[in-house]
Amino acid sequence: MVYSWFCVDHVGYESNPRNRELGFHKIFDRYVELKNSKKSSSDGIHFHYHPMPFSRSAHHCATKYFGSSDTLYQSLARKIIDRSWFPCAFRPGFNAIRPDSHWFLEQFIPFDFSNQAHISDTDLAPDLSSGRFGDWRRAQKNWQPYHPDHNDYQLQGNCKRLIMRCLNIGTRHRLLTQTDVDQAFLEAESKKPVVLSFTHHDFRDMRPDIELVRKMLINAKEKFPKVRFKYSEARNAVREALAINYEPAIKLNLNIRENKLFVDSSVPTFGPQPFLAIKTNN
């Protein structure tokens, strides 16, 4: 199988009772090292972000991206400056997108694995009901990527980025089932562009749950023998499903003229403005 590692920076917290790995690049560097090994060379490295809770505790959840901290900008800016890296794919912390994160992603990141629309949303525990952590009640419950609406990320619209459905394994809600996998194969049999994706967390032993998914794929393949599928990392999965052409690498030219910074691009950029990172002397 091929894996996509969505790496988070645990930074800016005042308490860390569960001893999470703190610091910029700590998790990112670990998985880059693994990817560079022969066994994981086909894996993908992508971006994950946990909004800062009011408590500033590393084990608490939050959904608001701006106002409580600048860790989102810090994390991305340091990836550019320290690692010469910027993401093209994203999965949101706590599966939650809101208008603030929706419009931020629309400027900079084209592939968004956040849609968790699921039949079980009508029967969630009280702490997860009413879209508390990830409101996907109006979103499409199929496996085709979609462009969201400007004012409602759950509906199809004319935004540039693509949102993919990505269900859970190994947890207590929005679980990927055999029915979901069969649905993906049925859609593929109907010649629809399908990206079947699921998510887990590396602080657990993921192997039993991933083996369960593999068995579900085998079962679906027996039901739909004409459907071909392949394991793929996140970026390539979207590109291949939608037949998105590979573009040449962007080349930027920076100049300072009359105390003004000018940035020229060799190709059109994804969003309306570039993400500019600056490192100061202090």
Annotate each PLM feature.
Residues 113-114, 180-184, 190-260:
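C-terminal domain-boundary segment and adjacent tail
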Residues 38-41, 65-87, 97-100, 107-115, ...:
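Secondary-structure boundary elements
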Residues 81-85, 91-192:
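Active-site-adjacent pocket scaffolds in enzyme catalytic domains
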Residues 244-282:
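C-terminal beta-sandwich/jelly-roll accessory domains of carbohydrate-active enzymes
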Residues 26-38, 44, 68-72, 76, ...:
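Acidic, His- and aromatic-enriched active-site or binding-groove loops in soluble protein domains
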Residues 1-38:
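Active-site beta->alpha N-cap acidic-glycine motif
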Residues 3-5, 43-49, 88-92, 113-115, ...:
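Hydrophobic faces of well-ordered beta-strands that scaffold small-molecule active sites
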Residues 11-24, 57-67, 86-93, 169-172, ...:
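The substrate-binding groove and active-site-proximal loops of carbohydrate-active enzymes
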